[in-house]
Amino acid sequence: MKNTIRRGLCLLLLLAMTAAMAACGQKNTNTGTDEKTMVYAVEAGSAGEEVAKEKGWTVNSVQDQAAALMEVASGTSDAAIIDLLMAGAMIGEGTSYPDLTYTDRLTEEEYGIGCRKGSDLAQYINCVLGDAYQSGTMQKLAQQYGITEELLVPQQEGTFTAGEDSDVSYIQQKGTLVVGITEFAPMDYKDENGQWIGFDADLAKLVAERLGVEIQFVVIDWGQKINELDSKAIDVVWNGMTLTDGVMSAMACTNAYCKNA
C-alpha cells in the first residue's frame, strides 16, 4: 500500500431539511442554529462520525448512510453527514429525498477496499482494477452509475504474487468471495429484482470472475467491519470505504480507486 494514500479525498456533506419540509411540521431548516445544539445522524464507524465527534457535535449513530437520511427526513435528527457520491444519488429533485439539500462540505477523502491484515487479496484486487481502468471498463461503469470520470483515481496494471499464507488461494478453494457492504447508492444497492448492483458491486463481480469463484454480498454492521474480516465472516470490505489512518493500520488496503470531491 502506497504511503501517498492519505486521509482525505472524498467529501462529506451536511444535509439539512429545506423550508418545504419544515412547513409540514418537521424540524426547522437550522438556519442560524448553533451547530453544537443540533443532532447529526451519522453512520456508525464512519469518517463522518469521526469528524462530527472531533467537532464536539451531538451524534445519532445509525446502521448506515441510508438510515442517516431517514433520520433527517423523519425529523429525529437535524442533519446527516454522508458522502458526496451518495448525496448525488439520493437527495434533491428526482430522488428519494427531494426535500433534502446539502449545505456544507466538511472533509475530503479517498476510497479504498479493505482486506484482512496481511492478506494478499488487496494486491490481487489492485491488479484487477488496473486492468479494468486500462481497458476502459472502470470508466464505463462509472458513467453507468453517474460517477464522473474525474472522480476516478487512475489505476496501473500490475502483477500478482501469492503470499505465503495466501488469502487468494483460500478464497479460490472455498469457491466464494464474500463481500461486506452496506446499502450505499451508487456503490452498492439492490435493483428491482433484488440483486446487488452499483459501481463497487460490479467491480467486485469482476474480481470474483477473475478468481473463478461465486460472489456473495453480505450487509454488515459498519462499525464491526474489522471484526467481520478477522473472523472470516467476510473476505473484503467494499463499500465506499474511506482510507483513514485507523482503517489502513487495521486492514490490508488497496490503492485508492475513487475520490469523492
Where are these regions (language model features)?
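Extracytoplasmic small-molecule ligand-binding "clamshell" domains
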Residues: 32, 42, 50, 55-65, ...
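Sec-dependent N-terminal signal peptides
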Residues: 8-17
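C-terminal motif of bacterial Sec signal peptides marking the signal peptidase cleavage site
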Residues: 19-23
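Bacterial N-terminal signal peptides that target proteins for export
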Residues: 1-9
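Acidic, polar ligand-binding/catalytic clefts
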Residues: 28-33, 86-108, 115, 205, ...
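Ordered, small/hydrophobic-rich secondary-structure cores
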Residues: 26-37, 45-119
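Extended ligand-binding regions for polar small-molecule ligands
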Residues: 27, 46, 88, 107-158, ...
